[in-house]
Amino acid sequence: MMSTLSYTLGQLAAHVGAQVRGDADLPIQGLATLQEAGPAHLSFLANPQYRKYLPESRAGAVLLTAADADGFAGTALVVANPYLAYASLSHLFDRKPRAAAGIHPTAIVAADAEVDPSASVGAYAVIESGARIGAGVSIGAHCVIGARSVIGEGGWLAPRVTLYHDVNIGARVSIQSGAVIGGEGFGFANEKGVWQKIAQIGGVTIGDDVEIGANTTIDRGALSDTLIGNGVKLDNQIMIAHNVQIGDHTAMAACVGISGSAKIGRHCMLAGGVGLVGHIEICDNVFVTGMTMVTRSITEPGSYSSGTAMQPAAEWKKSAARIRQLDDMARRLQQLEKRLAAVTSSGDASSDA
């Protein structure tokens, strides 16, 4: 049976530096949305579009800004940024199991691998020759840590994560199930129509505080390492090809594809399904909207999009039909421009006579 986590509202307020408006001894046993919260839940209002749910919410207390709290009759924790406060408090209610330190008897650890005594190695995990596992690292069941790979302190690997050889991971990195780090990059040379394989002799280097989602793949470099900066956040099912460089604190949503040798700056955001061609550069502070295909370098910060927005199917079909007519329309427009120029030129000549 799952035990109940419980904190007083005052304890939660102290954790995030909030001002309590109401009963500081109120017990809180979980977090929930405004629509779903009950009397034992703490909720939050961060997005104005959900303000309409605040008056009728059954939440025991709500994280609010001072402005929103002034008109609220219920119990509140007043903070400058409710969403950040919610993020901090979420860890208090996280029920993710914490593995005990030690190596499971079914795990296979090479004689010359180094595993910190405070680390946890799960059932049937494999740690190959020369690998180094830092303090407090948790390695889930059936993970494979390749030769000479390094995992920094506080790392967490869900079950069935694969690190190939020579992968260097910084501190406090979380990797979800199915991720493959350090697979061979897609490198081939064409000889008279036949593809000859290029050995991928680089590695992968990942900074501190990185999160990597389920079934995401990061290929090793052809010569130098593929580089993932500090604080990068990668969603599920992302493909990062060989030699890619991603700057600090950049975030990518699911199904992004980054082609080889692309460079992405710091503090960028790539929405779901974005694709980048290879050998281009994206500067810092760029936001790319969902399903955009980036085919050239971006040198100025800002928001970028491509493709067509959603519209009713019948209208979309008409738009698609017009796209097929663009070449003919352009040709006809050029003809009209030439005729107009001729008429204008003729008129000017007549007025001069």
Curated annotation (Swiss-Prot):
EC number(s) per entry: 2.3.1.191
GO biological process: lipid A biosynthetic process
Keywords tagged on the record: Acyltransferase, Lipid A biosynthesis, Lipid biosynthesis, Lipid metabolism, Repeat, Transferase
Keyword Transferase appears in the UniProt entry: yes
Superkingdom, taxonomy of origin: Bacteria
Keyword Lipid biosynthesis: yes
Protein known as: UDP-3-O-acylglucosamine N-acyltransferase
Protein's job: Catalyzes the N-acylation of UDP-3-O-acylglucosamine using 3-hydroxyacyl-ACP as the acyl donor. Is involved in the biosynthesis of lipid A, a phosphorylated glycolipid that anchors the lipopolysaccharide to the outer membrane of the cell.
Active site (record annotation): H242 (proton acceptor)
Pathway annotation from the record: Bacterial outer membrane biogenesis; LPS lipid A biosynthesis
Listed GO MF terms: N-acyltransferase activity
